[in-house]
């Protein structure tokens, strides 16, 4: 079940045992930082349908929010079984009218080019990895899986300790004992966060979306 930023912030405050020191705006900013960093390791896997017009082979991917990587392209969408097209440079002699696509401008928003000429009403199904959206209100759902929220909480905890550390550095204790303890805690908090990411990586299944299979020239069919 998707949970909201408000619910995540409540969890964070319980872990920090604090309802006063950091305003909501500060914790929200840390949540955004956590989502950006988490996307580097576990991007959001989602899909986008693109409506085609007659014989137009080029389409924008601007609706693919936070696009990082195109995983597969189905065209035309809706066939049973699904029909996937392969990526091939549009400069290839085989590209035009073939079951291919290319991404000549992969930088967001990006562009996708089909080898085949679509009909009006056809759709392109794009499965892609993208950044997790940054919530703009307390009631917007966090797209990170709930079982991965531990990493987000650890990231915010790390940032909270770092801020305490910086505050102590600006007004150091005469004995420097507090600063020393905070330094150790800050380093440990970062290690815990990185360790949690490695733990998730180790436990996540390797399985993912399957793209099209293309027979090698040496393969034989019996």
Task: List where the protein language model places each region.
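Hydrophobic transmembrane signal anchors and adjacent membrane-proximal interface regions, especially
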Residues: 6, 47-48, 69, 86
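Structural recognition of short helix-loop-helix hairpins that underlie histone-fold modules
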Residues: 12-22
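Solvent-exposed beta-hairpin/edge-strand motifs
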Residues: 65-87
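Internal mixed-charge
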Residues: 1-11, 25-43, 52, 63, ...
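Solvent-exposed, conformationally flexible loop/turn segments
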Residues: 48-64
């Amino acid at each position: 079940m998707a949970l909201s930023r408000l619910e995540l912030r409540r969890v964070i405050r319980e872990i920090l045992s604090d309802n006063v020191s950091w305003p909501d705006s500060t914790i929200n900013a840390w949540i955004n930082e956590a989502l950006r960093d988490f996307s580097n390791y576990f991007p959001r896997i989602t899909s986008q349908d693109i409506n085609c017009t007659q014989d137009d082979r080029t389409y924008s991917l601007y609706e693919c929010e936070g696009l990082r990587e195109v995983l597969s392209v189905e065209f035309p969408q809706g066939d049973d079984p699904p029909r996937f097209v392969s990526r091939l440079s549009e400069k290839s002699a085989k590209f035009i009218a073939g079951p291919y696509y290319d991404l000549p401008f992969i930088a967001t928003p990006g562009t996708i080019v089909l080898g085949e000429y679509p009909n009006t009403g056809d759709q392109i199904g794009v499965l892609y990895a993208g950044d997790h959206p940054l919530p703009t209100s307390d009631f917007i759902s966090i797209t990170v899986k709930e079982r991965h929220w531990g990493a987000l909480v650890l990231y915010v905890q790390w940032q909270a300790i770092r801020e305490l550390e910086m505050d102590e550095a600006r007004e150091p204790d005469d004995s420097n004992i507090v600063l020393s303890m905070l330094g150790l805690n800050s380093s440990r908090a970062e290690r815990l966060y990185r360790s949690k990411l490695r733990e998730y990586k180790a436990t996540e299944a390797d399985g993912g979306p399957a793209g099209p299979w293309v027979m090698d020239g040496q393969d034989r069919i019996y």
